[in-house]
UniProtKB/Swiss-Prot annotation:
It comes from Edwardsiella ictaluri (strain 93-146). This is Small-conductance mechanosensitive channel. The keyword Transmembrane applies. Belongs to the MscS (TC 1.A.23) family. The lineage of its organism: Bacteria, Pseudomonadati, Pseudomonadota, Gammaproteobacteria, Enterobacterales. The gene is mscS. Homoheptamer.
């Protein structure tokens, strides 16, 4: 009895297949086509991702940023590939895209700040206002760029503090790059007493500048009276030097200016206050 039931089931299934062979053949063709689309799409996504990584590394971009951008491109291609495969199987892709769009909008509103940092990170990668190893001022935060990531940038300060700055804040503010140009101007203000001779002061300061071989004299040297302040004559000294020598030149000039002014008996004023005491005498009436 059981054997007859099995035979009847097989015959019934065979009959159904014969009656619906055209429909099944169409589904089989669509299924094979969808699989082929997925395979080809995956190969294309992998090839483009690999090529993009090679090109971005050749431009010297940060490895983390390179792999992140390559992954984003790969996933975007895979998403379009999956939608195309579903469309081949007869799925209404319009509704799928609508659902994904609504979900993307909801996620975008929830992660508005993070997406802003992401967009800013992409702009920093594309326009390269600074690179790893350069000294920059990012909205009042000064340090050496350690790493440029897709959501934030890491700086190391001179006293070895690590500061993480959101990329959105960087794009919204001013970016000052101290390392991009090979040369940099050093500005120093020197205050002397009012009784000092202007020409003598300029000569003394000029001799100190001329003795420093690190200064790029061909780029120009400026030594002028800049301000007649409340208690001093302020001279401005402007010289040019290589970027790597900036602070060494600055500190050495400051020390040598003090020695030279002392050697020539030129006073350096400092803030002072005169206090006058008056003794009140109370008159006595006789």
């Amino acid at each position: 009895m059981k054997e007859l039931d099995v035979v009847d089931g097989i015959q019934s299934a065979g009959g159904w297949i014969v009656r619906n062979q055209d429909l099944l053949l169409g589904y089989a063709v669509n299924l094979v086509a969808a699989v082929v689309i997925l395979i080809i799409g995956s190969l294309i996504a992998r090839g483009i991702s690999t090529t993009l990584i090679r090109l971005l590394k050749a431009r010297g971009l940060d490895v983390t940023v390179v792999h992140f951008l390559a992954a984003m491109v790969r996933y975007a291609i895979l998403a379009f590939t999956i939608i195309a495969a579903l469309g081949r199987l007869g799925v209404q892709t319009t509704s799928v895209i609508a659902v994904l769009g609504a979900a993307g909008l909801a996620v975008g509103l929830a992660l508005q700040g993070s997406l802003s940092n992401f967009a800013a990170g992409v702009l920093l990668v594309l326009f390269r206002p600074f690179r790893a190893g350069e000294v920059v001022d990012l909205g009042g935060v000064t340090g050496t760029v350690r790493e440029v990531q897709i959501f934030s940038t890491t700086l190391a300060t001179a006293d070895n503090k690590v500061i993480v700055v959101p990329n959105g804040k960087i794009i919204a503010g001013n970016i000052i790059n101290f390392s991009r140009e090979p040369k940099r101007r050093i500005d120093i203000i020197v205050g002397v007493a009012y009784d000092a001779d202007i020409d003598v002061v300029k000569r003394v300061l000029g001799d100190v500048v001329a003795a420093d071989t690190r200064i790029l004299h061909d780029d120009g040297v400026t030594i002028r009276l800049n301000e007649m302040a409340a208690s001093s004559l302020n001279f401005v000294v402007r010289v040019w030097g290589n970027n790597a020598d900036y602070w060494a030149i600055y500190f050495d000039l400051m020390e040598n200016f003090k020695r030279a002014l002392d050697a020539n008996n030129i006073g350096i004023p400092f803030p002072q206050m005169d206090v006058h005491l008056y003794q009140a005498v109370k008159a006595r009436a006789e």
